[in-house]
Amino acid sequence: MQIMVRDNNVDQALRALKKKLQREGVYREMKLRRHYEKPSEKRAREKAAAVRRARKMERKRMERDGIK
């Protein structure tokens, strides 16, 4: 990954770098890899996230259709 520093403005270049890293998901991956996660824990975490997403989508659909 490469960021150009223009007019010796390091602060702006750092902000651009952080934004790129955030968009690429590097921070999220670093957080996940900080400690070892057992495969069973990973499956449980991913399943819980899927359930949350499904509930959220269902709520959005119900709200959109006017059913409450």
From Swiss-Prot:
It holds the Pfam family Ribosomal_S21. Keywords: Ribonucleoprotein, Ribosomal protein. The keyword Heme does not apply. Residues 37-68 are annotated as: Disordered. Residues 37-49 have a biased composition (Basic and acidic residues). Belongs to the bacterial ribosomal protein bS21 family. This is Small ribosomal subunit protein bS21. It comes from Erythrobacter litoralis (strain HTCC2594). The lineage of its organism: Bacteria, Pseudomonadati, Pseudomonadota, Alphaproteobacteria, Sphingomonadales. The gene is rpsU.
